[in-house]
């Protein structure tokens, strides 16, 4: 089969880390001083067996219950202190073939956002 891919915009930088994580970076001048980080995990409801129903969605929710660098409600507390509110800003969703975590954050706090996504990955 001859598969054709949609070409990537020339303004998008992308690559793959040694651990297999593929990343995409796109500069956007608006809104000024803001960034949106997303982690898309290839795990969704269609990949679950009958006895695993709901596991991807459950895992999505558990990410907000703590991580290596942010135990307990540390993720929510840390981001809230930076002006990112859980639910209104900080969010996630589980689809058929993916789970996506979304962190809109001030550009000056990118390292914190990346550290959280690294824990979740």
Where are these regions (language model features)?
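Divalent-metal coordination cores built from histidine and acidic residues
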Residues: 114-117
